[in-house]
Every structure is written in structure tokens, then in C-alpha cells.
Amino acid sequence: MASDGTSPLPGPDMSMKPGTGLSPFSALPFAPPPPVPPDQPLWEPSPQPPIPPVFSPSNPLLLSAFPSPLLVTGEGGPGPSVAGTGQVIVKVKTDVGPAESSQTQNLIVTQTALNWIPSGAPCGSQEGPPPPRYVTASNVKTILPAVAVGVSQEGLAGLPLQVLPPAAQLAPIVPLEKPWPGTQATTMEGGPVAARKPSQGDLAYASKGVYENYRRWQRYKVLARTHLSQSPDVEALSCFLIPVLRSLARLKPTMTLEEGLPRALQEWERTSNFDRMIFYEMAEKFMEFEAEEETQIQNAQLMNGSPGLSPIAPLKLDPPGSMVPEACQQPVYIPKKAASKTRAPRRRQRKPQRPPVPEAPKEIPPEAVQEYVDIMDGLMGSYVDTGKTEEEEEGQQEGAGMYPDPSLLSYIDELCSQEVFVSKVEAVIHPQFLADLLSPEEQRDPLSLLEELEQEEGLNLAQLVQKRLLALEEEDAQTPPSCSGAQSDSSPSVSDEDEDGGQRRRPSPGLQGAAGIVRIGKSASPGKQAREIHGGQEQTLGGPAGIHKDGNNLPSPSSWDVQLELTASQGMPVLLGMERKMSGKAIKQLSATQDGHLGRTGSPGYYPVADRNPEVLPCCWQEDPQHMRAPNFDVGLTEPVPLQGLGLEKQALTLQIGKRIGGAGMLTRGREPPSVVSQKGSSRAVRGDDRGPGMLQSYSQNHSPGAAGNLDRVSLSPGLWLSSDMGAVGLELPLQIETVIDSIQDEACRREDQALNSRNSASLGPRKNTVPKDVGNSVIPSGGPDTTAVPEKRNPCSLPGSLMASGPGLRSKEKISKENQALSPKTIQNPSDLWAEACPPLLPTLVSSTLGSSKDTLIPTCQGNLLIIGTQDASSLAQTSQKAESRGNLLFPLLENIDQVTILDVKDDSCPQPGVSKDSCLSNFNSYNLQGEGREDTVSSKPTDLVPLQDNQESYTHETTKLTNGQGQGSTSPRWATRDAYILRETPIKEKCTSADRAKRRETEKEEEDEELSNFSYLLASKLSLSSGGLPLSTRQASGGQGIVKTSRHSTEVDDLGQPSPPPKSGKQALVGSPATVVERDQQGAQFNGSGQKPLALGMAQLPQPRKRRRDGFVTSKRKKRRRSQ
């Protein structure tokens, strides 16, 4: 050994330190090389060439490592030495190929002495010949392919074999990562070795560490099974022992394997599961290597046909103290492509080698192409021939019994193609049968239905239709009554012929009910709710009182079944199919065309007639530009009455409400003598001819609470006059009249009057007071149960300009031919009925309801030159529809370019106390705003003097502050350019206003009006000159026991700068008593009729002479001054 004490062959994990033990790998000592020069280090390559020629490239050798001390040569060693020559016979068994048999070569190494180096023996103390060359196993292993090496030791005769030490030294087993430079340099020198090319082993250096770790894993796996036989972590523990034992060998090289293994197990137990995952993955790879290696060995045996090669057996360590067998073999198989094998675990795509399967050619063989073409040709041919063979196939199927009648299918197809047949089938099919089929209920009686169907087989079509109608009628009769007590009237009726010859007849709908539906046919159940969505606002109808979206109560009945039957007339494209079903559908809008105007000049049109049940308020159609709120009136339209100066053809609408109250009817225009016609169950709209005065038709109807009894649920509309004789009304609603009156009046007193809108929105409600504009300058009070209102023709109001209407509208073509027709006292039979005259054929919406519950109520209504005032009792007067906004509801045509407006100033100083007077005047305003900014307000005033204060260019509206609780329904009205229309805001009034209070406050009103006139006149004038106004045709309706009141007015409302107008603040106060006097004064050409007849005061009590207005001169002078200033 070297004198410096360093190890001649340190391992890869051992530093070259003096006294370091040698690696336990067995090495074979060869012939001693020549002495090393003193200046040459031990690790330098030796200049001596390799000794034995057996280590040739043709026979690569692989010397396996043995767990035994190194066998070294030399003399004077500390271990036992043997004198004489020793031989080390190395038997090398090479695998040369399938054609050659295995060869065994014996390598005999002679040496003078064999010395064992015991464990821990110092190497530097040895002296003697130079150290021999050692060929380590790592250097030889790199030379592939695998060979089995057996080494045996032999001594001279009589010399015992050396025995292994009792314990093997624990040292790192990882072979040298790099070959010892001396060996490689030696092999490259001289002879054929220097000329050889790099073998596969040289290319396997990169994966050499993984392979050797794999071999150690195989050995440690046997060792781990001895300690952890039942543990499933044997493979992972074996991987863990590789680095741990290496580290222990570095720390303490003299530590034996038995000492290091318990420490390694302790470290394994301390390791966390997460850290163990690395070794589990490594063990998984090694197990894959092992399985693949076994598969390759078996494949090699099969391919080579070498039965002598045994499968790999793991190396078993001998127990300590056992002798090394004479020939210890460790078969090792290294695949030819070692480099590619080591990369296989990373890819995990390597599969066992199998014989290659012939791949399909990339080209489609022509046979397959031809077959495909043949198949497609066959399919296409059969498809083409299908049309030709369909009849034959059908004939075959019919012959097989699929169709018992061959011509049945064709016959059915022919019948189904006829619309008449389909309609007949629908009429013939029993509705109960369809209901049973579609009913989800299981309890059905098919036998009874079968019997009923058998009975119907003998009936013809007419009988079946009649039976269906009767069945529907019975169903309607069985419908549970709603709060309005509506009943169905299924008797078909046809109104009288028109005065133009009666070429067309207007049939009224046969079935009517109380659900919010506008349709021709069966009515829906009254308990359903109708929802009206308009302008982002939604109101729900159904319940004790309608609830508006803003929280205000809407005077709408629970649900109205509106039956609107429209007669085909020239220029009236009215949609007969418009319906409001259930709770959400808005009524379809009518198309807006000039031909759609009702009552065109020169065309005796036939107008919609709403014949309905006596206890239901139906709704009417709406105009096209905007949606309409829930209309709930049944209206009969009479012939048009041309407006003089406007050329407007007005349609009289008749609202038929009540049941069997008395002989009150619809006022029609004609020259026939008055007549009373009683009818059963259903109302009729009768049209008279032009041969006589207005003809009234009486109706036997009875008010229902939904129609006249509920103040919160009934809405009136323009052109409709309601007569509510509350004495004949049996209230069935949860809200009583008095309670409603109190609540409305209390709320009205809390509201402040709001200014008129600059957009001329004439919506009336509890927010603003607006006096309707009187188009006709005649006022005819009518009263008494048996009085007849004869309209007087006088003082036509000329409104120049064209009317632009999108729905049934009015066009200015001619002036009013008859002015101020007076109602004859003989015609009106029952003052509780409703009358309509000179109103546009535009039906209102359920926005607000003004239905007087008193006996004597005076309600002036607008639109026309006729003002009919009937005194009613104000004790039970009530008006509802609080804050019912009517934005966007267009019920009237657009009136534009209106230069002259006559506005009535309604005042009365002799208003009796609420509940005391017999007569009252209820002014209900139905205002409509085209811009959707309608304000709902009700001006309920006592018109003792109705004075039109208007010149040709200015319009002053003096509103009285003595206003009752009445509220009008607000809706949008067509715009009209109102020039110089001034509306004065009145001061709010208090809760209860007596006649004395009114007289005292008139002086205060004067002063306030003067200030208001001076302040707002110029502002309003400037505002109105720039913006278009709205012409609201407001309806003032009331009903009582004394007569029917109607006033035709144009209610003008201008909302400028948002100035509030005083709301009605009076309590339960009626504004007009029975002795009230109505005086109408014409201004600038407004005259009475040619006969000079004064307004008639009709009623049971004599009406006193009208008092002179205190402010007539003042107002006139003020107007003149303003007109001059402009």
C-alpha cells in the first residue's frame, strides 16, 4: 500500500482521507505493476498495460460485487497471510449468442501471498511491494452486455481457504459514477482495446445511477422483507434505504449493516407521509422496471431459444459468518437499448414488445369505394322511387287491413282542407266532451257523456248551436255573483234599425258577464282580476277597491265583463276581436286612421253598441296612440251629431246601468215624438230619425253595487252620463256610501291644489281642480222623475282647426245644425237611468269613477253645445277614484288649432249643507293628457251661474273654491293648441262650507283671483303660445232620483310651472240644491236659440231666478284689459 496512508481505490462517496477503509466491493488482484515513481500520485494511471488478454472487446466481462472484504495481495499485512503462491480462478461465463454455446473462461491470478484486510484495518501501515491494480466492479459493469461471473479462490494444497470476517462492513454500495481513470486509460492503450468504438455501456453513463439504484433496490427489498414482512411499504422502504444507508456510511464508515438498518427504520417511521410519497413513486418506477425486465427476459428466451438462461433471481445475502460458496452467480440481464429503457418510466408509454401488426393502407381500396357507390346508388334509387310506389304501398297496407275504408283517408283530407267543415266540426263538438278530455280530474262519467252525445246525433246543426248557446247561458247563470252582482244575459238581441234605412243592424252581444273582458261571447268569471298596464303604471281591478301603483285607491269594480259589439260601418275599422282576458291583457288599440273616425260626414255610419247586463259596467275601446285603462262601461252609440263650427261628428254614448229602475232611456237625435220602450233584461241603443225631437228609450234595469253603489269602484268617462238613483240601489259592497264619502272628503281636504300643467294636461283628480270647458253655451237644468229633457240649440262654439284622432275620432266638417236642444220633461221616465247625447264615441277607462249616490245630483258633462243639468240629492253624494292617474290614455281625438275656447265659471252661493239639500251639482272632470302627465282632480261645484268667460283669443277659467269631494277620472286627452287660455287657480277651501261661508269667502277669492290673474296670465300665455295643449273632453256624470244631468264641455287644463291648484276641500257638501239656478251667459256672440228661450229649470220644485254674479263686470273688464295688452 502507499506510504502516505491513502486508500488506493476510494469509493465515489468516500473522500480520500488517510486511514479511510476500502470499499467492500470485491476486486481481483492482478500481477503487480511496476513500482510507482515517488512523484506520481496514487490516483494517476499506471503505465503498465493490461495483463490478461482475456479482457478483450469481444468478451466483455462483468465482475459482480460481493459483500466481502477486499482481497488484496502483499506481504506484511495485518491480516492473515498465506505463504506460497495463491491462485484466484475467475470463471467467466459469456453469452455469445444463440448460435454459440456458453463458454466458461478461467482466469488464474497468481500471487505470492493473499492477505485479508479486516474491517477497520488501517491501510497506511502496510509496507511492501507496490499496491496491485484493482479492477472494480463498477469499471467492468459499464462494459455491456451482461455476463455471469463466478469467482472462486483456491490455494495450494494444504492451505485452508480464507474465511470471511464475521460481519460485513457497511459502506456505500453505489458504484463509481465515473470509471476509474487509470482503468480506462489502461484499456485505451495499445492492442486492439485502444481501437474499439464506444459501446452501449458508454452511452449508458447518464442513466447509470438510476440503474444501479434499481439494483440496490432489488437487494434492499429482500433485506426489508426480513424486517417488515407484513408491511406494504417494503418497496418504498427499500427505496428509502438507498440514500439513508449511503448517508450513514458517509457519517460512520465503520458502521455495519446490522447497525445501520435499525437506524434507517427509525428514520422511516419519523418521515411524514408527504415525504414518503417520493419513495412510493420511486418504488413504483422500480416495480415497473422489474416487471419489464422480466418480460424482456422471457421474450429473449423465446427469441433466442436459449434454455440455459434462467430468470432473474434477487440476490440473497448470506447470514453473517457463512462461507462464500465456491461459485456465486448473479445473473444480470441488461437490455440492448439501455438508454431508451431508462427514459421509458418517464413517458410511461412503453409497452411490451409484440409482433408488429400490419397497418391498414392509407388509400381506400377501390373495392370499398365501389361498394360505397353501389350502396348510395341503391339508397338514392329507392328514395326516388318512393313517390311512385307510395300509392301502391298504401294500397297494400289498406289491403292488409290498416284502413278499413280505402277512400277514408283521402276523404278526411278533403274535408279538413275546407274551412267551413272545420268550423262546423268545432260547433258540433260538445264542449263538455272537450272539457272532460282536457280536464286533469279523474272523476269523470263517460257513460253520461256518451248518452248525451247519442241524443245529439239526431239534431241538426242549428239545433246543436242553439243547444250550445243554452248551455253557455246556463253556465253563465250558474257563475257565482261577484260583488257587483252581475248576471249574464244570453238572449240575443238586435237593436232597432238606424234612421238611414236600417240596411245594417247592430246585434248586441248575446253573452255578457262581470269579468274584465272586452269580447263578443262568453264572459269570464267575475272574481277574476284585470290588470291594466299603462305608461309603467299598473292598476289591479278586483277586490273591494282597486289599488293604484302609487298607493291610491282606484274606483274599479272587482272585475268587469265588458261585452262590446261593434257594428260594421263605413270608415270604422274597429277590432271586434279585442279582448281583455283574465288579469293581464290590455285592450287592443284601434287603428288610427281617418277612415277609423266614427261618424264621418256624409257616411251614415253604424257605431259600436255595448249592450250589456243591467248590473255590470262594461268598458269601451280606446284610441290608438296610447293604452287605455280598464274601461268598464257598457255604451250604446247613437248617430253622430255634427258640431257647428267644428265639423265634428259626435257620437252619443249611452251608458246602460241599473236594473228595472224605471223608464229612463237613451236620448237620441230624431224628430219622432217621444216614446218609451221597455225591454226585458237587456238594454238597447235606439237610433231615431231626424223627424222629431230627441227620443228616449227606457230600460228596465237595476243598479248594481258595482255599477252605482260603490264609489270607489265605478269610473265614469267622457260622453257617458250616469244616473244613480241611490234610493233604488241595493248596496252589496263592503264599503258603504257614507264611509266612502267621508274618506274621500277627508282626503280631499288634506290635499293641496296643484297648478295647472303647461302641457295642457286636463286630468282631474284630487290634485288639481279644473273646470271643464263648455263647448256648447246652453245650460238646461232638468229635474223631476217625469221630466223630459229637450236639448236647445243655441250659440254654437266654433273651434276652427282640424281634429287629429287615431282612434274613433271626430273630424271638423260641419257646424252644429241644431243648437241647444232642450230635453222634454215628458220623455224622461226614470231619472236614475243614464243618458248620452253629443258625446264622442270614445269609451273611457277605469281610471276613476264619479258616481253620485245621492238622489239629486247635478253633473255637467262635456263635449257639445248642450248643457243639461239635473238636480239630484246631495245627501249621499260621493265621488271616488282618488289619485287615479291616467297617463297616456287617449280617449279623444287630437284637437289642434283651437283659437276660441269657452270656459264656464261655475259658482253657486246658495249651496246647502251636505245631507240637507235635495239638489246638488256634481262636476266631475274626466281629464286626459296626451303626454301622460294627467292629474286627476275633481271639481265638484255648484253651478248656479254657468258663465262662459271667453273671447275669441282668451280663455279664463274661474274655478270656485267651494268644491265637493267628487273626483274625476284622469286620462290622457288629445292635444289641442289652446291660444291664450288662462286658468285661474282657486284658493283651497276648508272642510265644511256652508252658504254663509261661501258668501264670506267670495270676497277673499276675488282678491286672490285678481292677484293670480295678474301673476299667471302672462306666464300662462307665453307658455301656451309655445306648447300644444290638450283638449280634455271631460264628463260630469251624476245620477239621482230627480233627473239626468249632462253637460258637454271641453275641460281645459293648463299646468304651468307646476303651480298647485286648490283641491276640493269641502266635506260632504253638495254644491247645487234643488232651487239652484243655472244661468249661462254667452260672451261675444254666444246667444240663446232663435226662439230666445231661456234655460229651463226642470224639477219638482220651482227653481228661483238666478242671482247676478258679483264679478261679472270685474272679470269682463279684466279680460278686456288683458286682451288689449296682448
From Swiss-Prot:
Bias-annotated ranges (Polar residues): 962-975
Keyword Nucleus part of the UniProt annotation: yes
PTM field: Methylated at Gln-1042 by N6AMT1. Phosphorylation on Ser-1022, Ser-1025 or Ser-1027 is important for cytoplasmic export.
Biased composition annotated in UniProt, kind: Pro residues: 30-55
Modified residues (N5-methylglutamine): 1042
Principal location class: cytoplasm
Name recorded for this polypeptide: NUT family member 1
Organism (species): Mus musculus (Mouse)
Gene: Nutm1
